[in-house]
UniProtKB/Swiss-Prot annotation:
Molecular function (Gene Ontology), one example: acyl-phosphate glycerol-3-phosphate acyltransferase activity
EC number in record: 2.3.1.275
Function per UniProt: Catalyzes the transfer of an acyl group from acyl-phosphate (acyl-PO(4)) to glycerol-3-phosphate (G3P) to form lysophosphatidic acid (LPA). This enzyme utilizes acyl-phosphate as fatty acyl donor, but not acyl-CoA or acyl-ACP.
Topological category with respect to the lipid bilayer: Multi-pass membrane protein
Pathway: Lipid metabolism; phospholipid metabolism
Superkingdom, natural source: Bacteria
Protein name: Glycerol-3-phosphate acyltransferase
Subcellular location: Cell inner membrane
TM spans (from-to): 6-26, 56-76, 82-102, 118-138, 141-161
Enzyme class label: transferase
Family: Belongs to the PlsY family.
Catalytic activity: an acyl phosphate + sn-glycerol 3-phosphate = a 1-acyl-sn-glycero-3-phosphate + phosphate
PANTHER family associated with the record: GLYCEROL-3-PHOSPHATE ACYLTRANSFERASE-RELATED (PTHR30309:SF0), INNER MEMBRANE PROTEIN YGIH (PTHR30309)
Gene source species: Shewanella loihica (strain ATCC BAA-1088 / PV-4)
Amino acid sequence: MSLTLLTLAMILTAYLAGSISSAVLVCRLRGLPDPRSQGSGNPGATNVLRIGGASAAAMVLLFDMLKGAVPAYVAFRLGVDAVSLGVIAIAACLGHIFPIFFKFKGGKGVATAFGAMAPIGADLSLALIATWVIVVLICRYSSLAAIVTALLAPAYTWYFDERFTVPVAMLSLLIIIRHKENIHRLLKGEESKVSRKKRTDGN
């Protein structure tokens, strides 16, 4: 198989893997309400935290990260170039955001994007996690934490391993675009903060 065909196959595989909505499946297995119709209506870890608590949210977070990490890592090991790696990672995120198996109603893609970046290195992963946690602790906005982390991710990547700056920048742009409604609410002071009891929409 040529590298071009391999890349196309990986893009399709990444999208299909991303289309498996772990939030919906975990909620079904746990007997919880459908996250698409409860809380923020967003099938992501933050909304599952509100609906079902920390353990359910942790499962969703792990599975969503794997949807990005596995295709990106496999493609890297197969010798796919950096820009194509970015496209494959974006395909996984687009599967999460617009899942073909769940009527194209998905989440924000934050955990999947992080999963795709994680194989670059533990130092980058720790920097991204630390940034997200610090912003959440300061302001309690999951969406703002995701946006700030996405903005800083290319700079972190350039510092730790500049080979992957372009694909990470591609992922960051997708995350920021996906959060445009959150940005509008933040500017208006209408965004919900992280809470298990209040409406949240940042993940």
